[in-house]
């Protein structure tokens, strides 16, 4: 919810405090519904990689991707993607695999590749627990979660298409990281890494966790307002 002025100030702080030779990469995640030329110009100027949440064609995307008023968001998301493309901004499709699209893996992949022109794709399984008290606990999951067999079938459909024609042309995080591990090259996904905890999750209040999948009281490392991260 922060505006452009906030992010311009962040870029000034990065330039001021970056160590000599240090390389800093900028990424941001958005639903793209409010992106305009000003945002796109800013992202292009600072070489941001923009992750855009989109779950397939309209009939699949809009099952769960609706705004607070209950209106579908698909058309606004696609408009935002086109704005990014018009300004040459690198973008990444962040596609959740859920109960609505789990049986349509190939359709989703072809839509992202052929209609949106996505060259970077992440498939993210929706596995969420009810949180009546604010903290998700227990083993029950919500109705929109992908089923284990559905997730496997989804990835298998996509892989069969990808391995035949898109290796080296379309980056699918799950597949490329798996191939990297096979070749003894460190991958970017924590689930394929030897150890966990290389991607810290910092909450707005200063709470620090070793992974954004475990932002729960049992996994709290500390708070940076009380304890420096180096400790």
Region spans (language model):
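Canonical radical SAM enzyme core domain
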Residues: 1-50, 54-60, 67-79, 83, ...
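Glycine-centered loop/turn positions within well-structured domains
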Residues: 59, 91, 227
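Radical SAM enzyme [4Fe-4S]-AdoMet core and its adjacent flexible, acidic
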Residues: 63-75, 82-195, 201, 205, ...
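Active-site flanking residues adjacent to catalytic metal/cofactor-binding acidic residues
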Residues: 54, 211-212
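Short, surface-exposed helix-loop/turn micro-motifs enriched in polar/charged residues
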Residues: 20, 24-27, 171, 198, ...
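Flexible mid-to-C-terminal extensions adjoining Fe-S/redox cofactors in radical SAM and related proteins
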Residues: 215-231
């Amino acid at each position: 919810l922060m505006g452009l002025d906030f992010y311009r100030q962040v870029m000034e702080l990065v330039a001021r405090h970056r160590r000599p030779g240090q390389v800093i990469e900028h990424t941001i995640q958005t639903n793209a519904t409010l992106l305009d030329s000003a945002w796109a110009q800013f992202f292009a100027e600072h070489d941001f990689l923009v992750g855009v949440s989109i779950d397939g064609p309209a009939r699949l995307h809009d099952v769960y991707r609706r705004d607070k008023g209950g209106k579908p968001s698909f058309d606004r998301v696609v408009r935002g993607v086109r704005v990014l493309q018009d300004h040459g901004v690198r973008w990444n499709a962040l596609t959740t695999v859920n109960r609505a699209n789990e049986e349509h893996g190939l359709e989703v992949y072809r839509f992202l590749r052929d209609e949106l022109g996505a060259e970077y794709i992440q498939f993210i399984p929706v596995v969420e627990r009810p949180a009546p008290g604010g903290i998700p606990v227990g083993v029950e999951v919500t109705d929109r979660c992908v089923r284990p067999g559905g997730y496997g079938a989804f990835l298998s459909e996509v892989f069969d298409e990808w391995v035949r024609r898109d290796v080296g042309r379309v980056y699918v995080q799950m597949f490329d990281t798996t191939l990297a591990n096979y070749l003894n090259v460190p991958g970017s996904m924590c689930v394929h890494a030897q150890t966990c905890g290389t991607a810290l999750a910092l909450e707005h209040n200063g709470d620090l966790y070793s992974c954004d999948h475990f932002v729960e009281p049992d996994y709290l490392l500390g708070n940076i307002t009380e304890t420096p991260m180096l400790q």
